[in-house]
Structures are given as C-alpha cells and as structure tokens.
Amino acid sequence: MGDRNNVHTPPVRSAYMQITWLGHSCVLLSGTKKVLIDPFIDGGSVAWTKPDFVAVTHGHADHMGEAVSIKRPTVAITEIAKYLKAKGVPSESMNIGGTIELRGVTFTMTPAMHSGRIEQTGQGYGGGTAAGFVIRMDGVSVYHAGDTGLFSDMKLIGELYHPDVAMLPIGGRFTMGPDEAMMAANFVGAKLVIPIHYNTWDKIEQDPLVFKQAIERTTDIKVKVLMPGEMVEITT
C-alpha cells in the first residue's frame, strides 16, 4: 500500500488565452477553442483563423462581416441569428442579459448603446439591438463592448463578470471616443484594456498611444495597443 502522505498533486494550470486583434473590432480569442468576434476581415484572414465559434455584436456590415461565408456556429441576438440561419449558418440565438455555454465557452450578452440594423447586399433588415459580450474560456474572462457609447451600467458588467480584459471602442463619432472609453475602463475595472474600432476610416481616426498614456498615467489599468494581426497572451 502506497504512502498516503506522498500522493502526487498535479501542477495547477494558470488560466491562459491568446487574443489577436485583426483590425477594426475583429478579435480572435484562442484557447482550448477559438472564438472570432465581429469577423470584418478578408477571406484570406478567415482561412487561417479556423474558429470554433463566431460572435456577432450587431448587424452593421463592419461587424457582421464574413459571418455568412464563414458558416461556423455563430452566437448573436435573436434577430441576427434568425437571419443567419436563413443563410445556412448554424446559429445560437440569445438576448441581452442571457448566458449560454457551448463546449466549454461561456457567452454572456451585455447591453450596448448603438443601432443594430442588418446591412447586407445593399438592403437593410431589422437586426434587433446592438450588444456586447463577456466571453469566458479557460479561466479568462473577456469583455468585448461592441459598438457603444458610454453608459453607467458598465459598472455592473465589471461587478458581475469581473473581466480580465476589456476591448473598448475609441474611434468616436459612431461610438465612444478616448475620453469616454477611459471612463468606461474605470467602470469595468479590467486590468488590461485593448482599444478597438479606430483608424479604419478618417472619420474614426484616433491616436491609441495618447489613450494609453492618459489611462496609465492616472490609473493602475494597463493598455495594450496592438497592430492588426498582433497577439497578446493573457495569464491570470
């Protein structure tokens, strides 16, 4: 009979995720599964991402992107999920405040202050309301705000879901600008912020380094400015 005081204890695995920014609001989360958020990317980029799931925050063309052509299981608000199913895309419908779990990945749909009409092939369809997501995988919690203005219930998102990383739009005009995003970062309370939705077009031109300096000068929050295609590793 073995020594009961000499039982082997397996090493504790740290939570781990890779986050790759693919430009605009498109982000790839890589862990035991791959989640592609707002797939506004070209076909070549789609080919190498090989996502297990796609998440769409709202119906605008710069967020719905290639969701139809990718045809991977897609998480979206009910109206968008219905539209995608009609296009042959396997879809999981949900709504604001709801949570679903798919093969070890948890999706919670959060509010966003933005419009959400589906824009495809020159026509518009009712796309429900815009949303954000808190996505939890492999012990890491990520908040993708989608397109949104600042709203005070971002504090609740922080209190309820404790995201490790917040991806916040900073482009202004159609979403928050840098000043509002700085306040949003404080509301959410994530230790790391990744700016998104900027510099795609002149109308949303911003300097992300100014945003980074402003936050890091006045808070303990870190900001990671990524180049398109660049990846950051998250451990907790």
Predicted feature descriptions by range:
Residues 20, 85-99, 182-236:
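Binuclear metal-ion centers of metallo-dependent hydrolases, dominated by the metallo-beta-lactamase
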Residues 36-38, 51-60, 74-77, 143-148, ...:
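Active-site neighborhood of phospho(di)ester-bond hydrolases with catalytic His/Asp-centered motifs
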Residues 41-85, 90-92, 160-167:
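Active-site metal-binding motif and surrounding structural segment of the metallo-beta-lactamase
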Residues 43-45, 60-65, 81-84, 98-101, ...:
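Active-site environment of divalent metal-dependent phosphoester hydrolases
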Residues 66-70, 83-87, 153-157, 180-184, ...:
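A short acidic, amphipathic alpha-helical/loop segment
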Residues 131-191, 196-203:
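Metallo-beta-lactamase
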